Amino acid sequence: NAGDPDREGQLLVDEVLYFVGNTKPVQRILLNALDEKSVKSALGDLRDNQDFHNLYQSALARERADWLIGMNLSRAYTLSERYKGNKVALPIGRVKTPTLALVVRRERELADFKPVDYFTVKILYTHENGTFWATWQPKDEQKGLDSDGRLINKGVAESLVQQLASSPDGVVKSVTKSKKKDLQRLPLSLSSLQVLAGKAYSYDPQTVLDTAQKLYEKKLTTYPRSDCEYLPPNQYGDRMAILSNLAQSGDEKLSQWAQNADRNIKSRAWNEKKITAHHAIIPTTVACNVNSLTQAERNIYFLISQAYIAQFYGEHVYEQTRIVVGQCEEEFVANGRVVIEEGWKSLYKRQKSKTNADGDEPDLTDERGAESGPKKDAIEEADHLPSVKKNDSVQYTDSSVESKQTKPPSRFTPSTLLQAMKEIHKFVKNEELKKQLKAVSGIGTEATRANIIDELISRGFMKTSGKKQVLSP
């Protein structure tokens, strides 16, 4: 049995063996990669196929559950609608129905959304070594706050500013400095590639999959339908050939990055224990001239190669400073962040969306999920703060009362909906279900999520609009 080393790979081959009535002994080979070293290693570690019978049963249960749910509930809901006079076929599926529900729920949240006006108070303090802005942190019992801790009474802000101006002396209550590191972003799985390409080029997930498949068929990149972001250590030796090829790829940025890469760095990506059925999508050792590719192929090859090269750049290192000022029995906080070593993030600076009309620059290093943002504003970070010590005196110099308004949750795009499918546990309140859904990496698979979104659109259950292809029911 040489099927993929996951439950679906086990099922596909075992079903054939059962169908033909095989009675001979069967051995199982577990292949995570198809390079010579990996294949030889797997051939030297063959297992009894019966050891994986539970994996087969797991996939069989999934297959039959999908069939029973689809066959029975699709008929039930379709007939129910026809009794109401609606001549419509309603396909119900274990994956497609909750996927559509995400879009419908977001639409209802938008319909029910009522913006809230609120205010932030910022104070400019002067210290002997320089000036800095600090943001007021109201106490929980402060009058004029809503249930989310936002100041909704402008009069409170204006009164505070007057009080501070009349008594301008402040003192530094604490100074906290910490050196922090951001590890190299991992190489790409299919879903992370689809999300990244959606941000960078507004490509829909199916376009990304189709393009990655073409690159795979040209032997320029590895297997595209992977859910893994790690690499087998026995492929670490291929880095020399891959980086040398990228240095001569014809793409100016890739060439420069590959030439400057530190080939002695071994990032966290090289981890045998984290490999699933397939390893992360990376460039192969086959040389590529990007000028021979279509624009879509070139863009997807660029993202895959960029993430691979990032493994050979250092960690992003920065110093974070937090200053707390006390004045008139209130606290004001200033945050500063100074980059010490740009590291791998130098590859992701000023990545501008090709189709973004409003000029926004998507953060291609952001690997957070698809949930809407925090309710409260984060304190802005300054590039530099003056050198201050605890108990130093500071003087109130100026103030700013900023009027803001809460923003509605963003509509899904095909790429963010795909990410939400993978992280469906974030949208579930039941703690037990949340754990189970997180353990199985959400609903759908790397190979099916894009197709499910496309099917919902083609059947008219969802529609896209605008350059960003936002989704609505």
Enumerate the language-model features and the residues they cover.
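Toprim catalytic domain recognition across nucleic-acid enzymes
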Residues: 2-425, 431-461, 466-470
